[in-house]
């Protein structure tokens, strides 16, 4: 097993996740099987209860693990399926060590950071790195490890020490370190001092970088590269210029041009890893597909505008998987994507009274969009604005996709304005004692724990069965006319089964349900170009080269190409089945 560690210095949020994902993707083009581990040095057990406005989105895995958003990057770039154990947090590793101490596993010894915690980290990495993550079912050849945060922070100290020891445990030819640093440009001059200081700190902790990936707003000058190489004690070929590009999908090719993979191939002796001809051909095809995808991205002229009506729009990372899914779909449709960010509460009449400009600007964005997306979320703020957006899309014939909460607000809007129940709502927003039974469109799922927040939702990969007589459905056609699909869930509330008949009698058809036939998973509005909602989160399974079908449908409908896309999908799926 080969290990490539990606660490960061100077500041956080510097792009370690994209660089780690891009490095892994390039290793896959050699035919290698690649896995990934993210280390997050915070005390939380997982990301499930963390505010999206503070930490960005919570990414959900097949096994229901609620993890850091970077695991989404790994899955999207590498085409792999990770588990909750691929995300190590301080809280998780401390809990593991304390549980072992309580069981008496340490035989009465004084339990310490070194060696007990650091050994536990190393054991965890070695165990998880061997878990198969792709459709081959085989043990990976390379593990990318991203160390979150900034080297030198007190929170990451145990992990840095564990990795220092780990490099000797596995051997130099099996361990490489890429350090990501910032090269700011001040008054037109590229400054290397922050990188020099970061590498000095890293070396003082016992970690020697094999490559230094320099993040900069512009291409590095040759003199800057030489200066970093000289003062950081590396060769110029070990300094990688990771300047800003118009899309993060260009980063793998940017690294490829600078011979990063050639260096890692030599440094880790990757030529000794046994590969079949099929492995090498699959890797070569991946590179070709990626190059074609980026070329299509650059050559696209037509623009598709999607209004994203959310409640966490002040931090775009809150909807990272959603925006990436829209990007994947747009590239597949050969369109340039323009996301119109609309804060849901700004669509509400109360905003007009307080700030007319904000109100009118938000409605102008919504009305100019080619398609409308209402993503998931929690709480009451902005709900009425989302309902108004769903109403606009339904009445105006604008393509619409509602995800999780988006499905629920679309159902509430339909119950209010089509069925004629103006007081319809959700028991999430109003106590059930304040809602008449017939007005409870969305209810708390009976099996969910109301007392505890962490890890108590309906989580992970679950089946959705397409219902009889749903062959007309666009969303079913987008999935290739299959009988069932498996998608990831994260919710506590569901459509009230008691209102389903009334909704369906007016054309609001629940074309997909769970295996019991009671829990509503997908709806589609008959007679509308594309008005779809999913209780699950399709954005969690979208891949760069294989977009999520509901998002693909939204962008295709917004581009006027839905019929062609469905035809192509059915031809492709039909050929595969023959």
Swiss-Prot record:
CDD domains associated with the record: CTPS_N (cd03113), GATase1_CTP_Synthase (cd01746)
Please report the organism this UniProt entry assigns to the protein: Saccharomyces cerevisiae (strain YJM789) (Baker's yeast)
Q: SUPFAM superfamilies per the record?
A: Class I glutamine amidotransferase-like (SSF52317), P-loop containing nucleoside triphosphate hydrolases (SSF52540)
Obligatory cofactor(s):
Mg(2+)
Q: GO terms for biological process?
A: 'de novo' CTP biosynthetic process; pyrimidine nucleobase biosynthetic process
Q: Which family does it belong to?
A: Belongs to the CTP synthase family.
The reaction(s) annotated as catalysed by this protein in its Swiss-Prot or TrEMBL entry are:
UTP + L-glutamine + ATP + H2O = CTP + L-glutamate + ADP + phosphate + 2 H(+)
Query: Which E.C. number(s) belong to this protein?
Result: 6.3.4.2
What NCBIfam families has UniProt attached to this entry?
Answer: PRK05380.1 (NF003792), PyrG (TIGR00337)
* PROSITE patterns named among the record's database cross-references: GATASE_TYPE_1
Top enzyme class:
ligase
Report the GO terms under cellular component.
cytoophidium; cytoplasm
Q: Which InterPro entries match?
A: Class_I_gatase-like, CTP_synthase, CTP_synthase_N, GATASE, GATase1_CTP_Synthase, P-loop_NTPase
The primary site where this protein sits is cytoplasm
Q: What is this protein called?
A: CTP synthase 2
Tell me the keywords, alphabetical order: ATP-binding, Cytoplasm, Glutamine amidotransferase, Ligase, Nucleotide-binding, Pyrimidine biosynthesis
The entry's function note states: Catalyzes the ATP-dependent amination of UTP to CTP with either L-glutamine or ammonia as the source of nitrogen. Plays an important role in the regulation of phospholipid synthesis.
Q: Which GO terms describe its molecular function?
A: ATP binding; CTP synthase activity; identical protein binding
- What residues form the catalytic site here? 404, 537, 539
Q: How is its activity regulated?
A: Activated by GTP. Subject to allosteric product inhibition by CTP. Inhibited by p-chloromercuriphenylsulfonic acid, N-ethylmaleimide and cyclopentenylcytosine (CPEC).
Cited Pfam families? CTP_synth_N, GATase
